[in-house]
Amino acid sequence: MRVLLIHSDYIEYEVKDKALKNPEPISEDMKRGRMEEVLVAFISVEKVDEKNPEEVSLKAIEEISKVAEQVKAENVFVYPFAHLSSELAKPSVAMDILNRVYQGLKERGFNVGKAPFGYYKAFKISCKGHPLAELSRTIVPEEARVEEVPEALRKEEEELVSYWYILTPEGELIEVDKFDFTGYENLRKFVNYEIAKNRIAEKEPPHVKLMLEHELVDYEPGSDPGNLRYYPKGRLIKSLLEQYVTEKVIEYGAMEVETPIMYDFEHPALEKYLNRFPARQYIVLSGDKRYFLRFAACFGQFMIKKDAIISYRNLPLRMYELTRYSFRREKRGELSGLRRLRAFTMPDMHTLAKDIEQAKEEFKKQFKLSMEVLEGVGLTPEDYEVAIRFTEDFWKEHKDFIVELVKLIGKPVLIEMWKQRFFYFILKFEFNFVDNLDKAAALSTVQIDVENAERFGITYYDENGEEKYPLILHCSPSGAIERVMYAILEKQAKLMNEGKKPMFPLWLSPIQVRVIPVSEEYLDYALYVAGKLEGAKIRVDVDDEDERLNKKIRRAEKEWIPYIVVVGAREKENGTITVRRREDGKQYETRIEELIKEIKEKTEGFPYKPRPLPLLLSKRPKFRG
């Protein structure tokens, strides 16, 4: 079943003609109708719903009721609408399910109207236009599900209701449909994405074209979808990001470890943990035993901590692994370039804290660490939106702490609040990048976990020598490395749309300087300049192609080279270079040593790796036709 929910000022319809040979019998007064201040449910009943009409009806009633509660609508209008699906159920089944939904909503106390089934109808509707006003839901009967989720868990999840707010740095908590989004358009887009929960990629995001054009990353037809290949320039960027985040986390105080990529389905602690997640694992068979490929570093780090002897003096205890790879079998329609993959590289730190106060202190520090890490890759708070999620009880007890976090970011954030705890954590934040298609992807995240220490048997000895269960903070200060690359490319696509020059952060640029001789006569001097730069650990190449100077410059511009160095007779005679700086468009003549000094100052504190391709352009293969 597909459901489109529109919170409306009114809806009115008029029957025009029969659409089916045997439509629903109706009286004269059913040929037209109107309802005001209403949640309209446009519904397509699908072929798969024939497997279990009762279950689909109950789930639809539940979903529609939840949304009606969120938008505070007392009136609900059920509108048969075949155009949400191409796989429709038999008319008799569809009519039965729609009537079940209609009656079920009435039994829940709503004032319910409906349009007749099987007719062509004209209708008018006035959508209210707030963030909750347009939502969609897909409901699938259990027999049709590919994934298996435990019945008790599914029931709990279905009953979980999210309450959405905007929290300002001044501490004002505002219901999301009452917040004035003027000046916060990106936040509005993020809110709409979060509440609608539509993860399907309808079209290709701009970063995909850029990753292919720049020969960074490509699809691998010989592998499972969502597993990518990286060309030399893309591997360099990814490798530098991995090194950068790892250095930041170790500098923060984490101990780096390495753990297996596969785990036993039947391990008691892992079995319980898996029940908290949808069954989207890759399965590996070894003899007659089944293993799953990890979707995070939690398992391995928890097993190490379970076996360790830990004192209260060791807390907070931070452990880190860069997982290459973590695996998650995302739905095919949700896979999208670098944004959502089935194999991804995740920097994953877990911190043990003795109590909630120490956990809050660490949470705040890791919030700041995440901001710092993203700033280093060229993403400021203006580039991402923040979501903070917690229970109502946590808000009541720790409101001032939450407001402190919002003050750090300096702008309004989205709040998701629950009446009771369903997940293993009591507090979570994410920094979310909203791309050019208005899709959001979580980057940095931290959670306070209150379940898994006991589940895995992780303990520490307190001041009195008694064993206690610590709290666990899950932290990825950047999010998946592939997602960071996605965010960088999507940001550059936005700049291009605004008529600005795109470029990678200087320390991440595969080639930082391109030296172009004005003719073959000056190739030796170009190589001399390149040698000086390379000796200073600057990634440099030389365009030795037999082409006109303007074409070479255009090629370097198209590749987003930060510094284009042109050398000819004057430069060779004076021992200088002429530089075009992409960042500000400035062109100037200088000495090699001065350019080295400028680049080293701008890349100080960031990791370095050598040039990923041959020095001379004429020696390079093309990876894409």
Curated annotation (Swiss-Prot):
Catalysed reactions, as listed in the record:
tRNA(Thr) + L-threonine + ATP = L-threonyl-tRNA(Thr) + AMP + diphosphate + H(+)
| Matching SUPFAM superfamilies | Class II aaRS ABD-related, Class II aaRS and biotin synthetases
Q: What InterPro entries would the database entry show?
A: aa-tRNA-synt_IIb, aa-tRNA-synth_II, aa-tRNA-synth_II/BPL/LPL, Anticodon-bd, Anticodon-bd_dom_sf, DTD-like_sf, Thr-tRNA-ligase_IIa, Threonyl-tRNA_syn_edit_dom_arc
The record ties this protein, via Pfam families, to: HGTP_anticodon, tRNA-synt_2b, tRNA-Thr_ED
- What's one GO MF term for it? tRNA binding
Cofactor binding, per record: Binds 1 zinc ion per subunit.
- The UniProt record gives the binding positions of Zn(2+) as 298, 350, 474
User: Which stretches does the entry tag as region Catalytic?
Assistant: 206-505
Q: Which HAMAP family match?
A: Thr_tRNA_synth
Output the NCBIfam families linked to this UniProt entry: PRK03991.1, thrS
State the oligomer form and interacting partners. Homodimer.
Q: What family, per the record?
A: Belongs to the class-II aminoacyl-tRNA synthetase family.
Name of the protein described by the UniProt record: Threonine--tRNA ligase
Q: Which organism is it from?
A: Pyrococcus abyssi (strain GE5 / Orsay)
